[in-house]
Curated annotation (Swiss-Prot):
The gene is Gabra3. 4-aminobutanoate binds at R119, T182. This is Gamma-aminobutyric acid receptor subunit alpha-3. NCBIfam families: LIC. The modification Phosphoserine is found at S427, S434, S443. Heteropentamer, formed by a combination of alpha (GABRA1-6), beta (GABRB1-3), gamma (GABRG1-3), delta (GABRD), epsilon (GABRE), rho (GABRR1-3), pi (GABRP) and theta (GABRQ) chains, each subunit exhibiting distinct physiological and pharmacological properties. Binds UBQLN1. Interacts with GPHN.
Length: 493
């Protein structure tokens, strides 16, 4: 049974409900609420759901607020551990490189340094948005919250991402879900070198990069602008002292490993060594040393000290040059073009020394002055002892000149050379007196003699220069033609 108090409670409640329904600005059940001017924040902005659009003041309708909400919506539920298109399609990463500086190149370590802007572009359906701007520049901090390619450099020994004053990274998001990710890198990459043609050698230093974990069934790489324009080198980007950058060749490779097949992007930078330094430092000194060694062929064969100095000095000089030429090279097990040149020059210098030894050995008994052989040609005539005089004469007369005889020291016949020849044109007998016996000897015929020139020297004066000239002609012609062929091959590629 309903009491009076309960009846009054129900009547009061019904009355309040009727009063609320009659008041303006209220809606009954089934009626739509009238939109007020300040209620726009509750609508979808750029695809935002009402739960991501909290109430804000009426004056906060600028782009910053709009894109803040866009980013909040995009990252809500985004899993950066999963690549775009997982399970549906292969993710394509487009790349291009702008080289700001190339070099230096280390021959001993067989590596080079390159500074680049490395750009990557890919599409992520999860990051599509609709807003007042088509391209949204983002801070580099957002890169850690989204999926990015796990690109690494296959032949990189050391890579540095620049962080001064902030990380040198750029991230842009297009409204269709395309991302551009750029970073500045300094890469120390390996450059295999074949030094057989050193210092006229040409090298192709590679730069290889690709995905570390994703096979070609998951992630593939391609060049953004094609093979001809995707790698660009700044005009003032060369930092090479000993090389010329001839050009670069862009390509793509597939490598196979135990974990699958991977796409590898390749760029080969072709370098040509500058030979000027080595011409001044090695080639010219070697050539001058060989020429100096051949000067000894024009010296008298009796000039033993002079010719010995020429030979020994030039051999030691070539030894020093050969050692110094190897200091700037890695310790390779094969001979380079410079090694062959130095070896041939060393052979010429050493041959010149051997030539002098040969000439000296076979001609040492036929030296110049014929007067030294006079004692063998003298006709000794023993005369009857002269009548003794009161005083034995201790002097003898040679062509009107009186010389004292030292009986204690001159026990043998003295050698008479051209310096003691008579100035008279006639041949006058010379009388040699002694206390007991008088000898009469005929003077040698006055014939002026000269130092004879060895036939070996005469032949060497012609053979050595001609052979050395032919060697230089063949040597330089071979490597100059090879350089032209290599440059033509690079242009075709």
């Amino acid at each position: 049974m309903i009491t009076t108090q309960m009846w009054h409670f129900y009547v009061t409640r019904v009355g309040l409900l009727l009063l609320i329904s009659i008041l303006p600005g209220t809606t009954g059940q089934g009626e739509s609420r009238r939109q007020e001017p300040g209620d726009f924040v509750k609508q979808d902005i750029g695809g935002l759901s009402p739960k991501h659009a909290p109430d804000i003041p009426d004056d906060s309708t600028d782009n910053i607020t709009i894109f803040t909400r866009i980013l909040d919506r995009l990252l809500d539920g985004y899993d950066n551990r999963l690549r775009p298109g997982l399970g549906d399609a292969v993710t394509e990463v487009k790349t291009d490189i702008y080289v700001t500086s190339f070099g230096p190149v280390s021959d001993t370590d067989m590596e080079y340094t390159i500074d680049v802007f490395f750009r990557q572009t890919w599409h992520d359906e999860r990051l599509k948005f609709d807003g007042p701007m088509k391209i949204l520049p983002l801070n580099n901090l957002l890169a850690s919250k989204i999926w990015t390619p796990d690109t690494f450099f296959h032949n990189g020994k050391k890579s540095v991402a620049h962080n001064m004053t902030t990380p040198n990274k750029l991230l842009r998001l297009v409204d269709n879900g395309t991302l551009l990710y750029t970073m500045r890198l300094t890469i120390h990459a390996e450059c295999p070198m074949h030094l057989e043609d050193f210092p006229m050698d040409v090298h192709a230093c590679p730069l290889k990069f690709g995905s570390y974990a994703y096979t070609k069934a998951e992630v593939i790489y391609s060049w953004t602008l094609g093979k001809n324009k995707s790698v660009e080198v700044a005009q003032d980007g060369s930092r090479l002292n000993q090389y010329d950058l001839l050009g670069h060749v862009v390509g793509t490779e597939i490598i196979r490993s135990s974990t699958g097949e991977y796409v590898v992007m390749t760029t080969h930078f072709h370098l040509k060594r500058k030979i000027g330094y080595f011409v001044i430092q090695t080639y010219l000194p070697c050539i001058m040393t060989v020429i100096l060694s051949q000067v000894s062929f024009w010296l008298n064969r009796e000039s033993v000290p002079a010719r010995t100095v020429f030979g020994v000095t030039t051999v030691l000089t070539m030894t020093t040059l050969s050692i110094s030429a190897r200091n700037s090279l890695p310790k390779v097990a094969y001979a380079t073009a410079m090694d062959w040149f130095i070896a041939v020059c060393y052979a010429f210098v050493f041959s010149a020394l051997i030539e002098f030894a040969t000439v000296n050995y076979f001609t040492k008994r036929s030296w110049a002055w014929e007067g030294k052989k006079v004692p063998e040609a003298l006709e000794m005539k023993k005369k009857t002892p002269a009548a003794p005089t009161k005083k034995t004469s201790t002097t003898f007369n040679i062509v009107g000149t009186t010389y004292p005889i030292n009986l204690a020291k001159d026990t043998e016949f003295s050698t008479i050379s051209k310096a003691a020849a008579a100035p008279s044109a006639s041949s006058t007998p010379t009388v040699i007196a002694s206390p007991k016996t008088t000898y009469v000897q005929d003077s040698p015929a006055e014939t002026k003699t000269y130092n004879s020139v060895s036939k070996v020297d005469k032949i060497s004066r012609i053979i050595f220069p001609v052979l050395f000239a032919i060697f230089n002609l063949v040597y330089w012609a071979t490597y100059v033609n090879r350089e032209s062929a290599i440059k033509g091959m690079i242009r075709k590629q």
